[in-house]
Amino acid sequence: MLEIKNLKAEINNKKIIKGLNLKISQGEVHAIMGPNGSGKSTLANILSGKPGYDISGDLKYEGEDLTQISIEERAQKGMFLAFQYPTEIPGVNTNNFLRTSLNSIRKAKGHKDIDAISFLKIVKEKAKELSIDEKFLSRHLNVGFSGGEKKKNEILQLKILEPKLAILDETDSGLDIDALKIVADGVNSYKNKNNSFLIITHYQRLLNFIKPDFIHVLS
């Protein structure tokens, strides 16, 4: 599904990743650990298409050159990034954002848009699984949300969009144990033989709840 060979990355002439090799097959869960500055979040940024990095090496997603796939196309092709610091977007209703995102992916696959009533039923069901109060669905995206609420909202997006490859960038950061368990349960309920995860974390505690097939340590 994802294959990285000899990835090197720098920004503003500062070398961050100095030759990373990684292969993630369908159905696998990989965890990446390491100290600050080791390149964990840089890797997530590069995979999601964030500009500003000078990179070399081979990055392939489902056999395609990832560097030639736009950010929008990456999402449409089944890539998903849960941010370490989810962005607040004033004026954008959470429910509408989720439905628009899902319909963009459905359109790319040649499927019809899902109507508002049908979607509301789905999103309420998924929100309940994550102990998310329905009132958050009508609020502006992440605006005024606590850290834990933002992280749970990211996992709600994951469960709605159903990506093939989910990249979780320090999703456990700032979570208390109860929120951590809810987030982990949300991830575990989505895991199956058809999707893969790349979990980036500072802490072992997340891996007590989400069991990876492989653990990689960056230095």
Predicted regions: what is each one?
Residues 33-35:
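The feature captures the beta-strand-to-loop junction immediately N-terminal to the Walker
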Residues 48:
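Helix-to-loop junction immediately C-terminal to a conserved catalytic motif
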Residues 58-74, 142:
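ABC ATPase NBD Q-loop/coupling interface
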Residues 87-164:
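ABC-family P-loop ATPase nucleotide-binding domains
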Residues 170-171, 178:
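Walker B catalytic motif
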Residues 210-219:
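H-loop (His-switch) and adjacent beta-strand-loop-beta switch element
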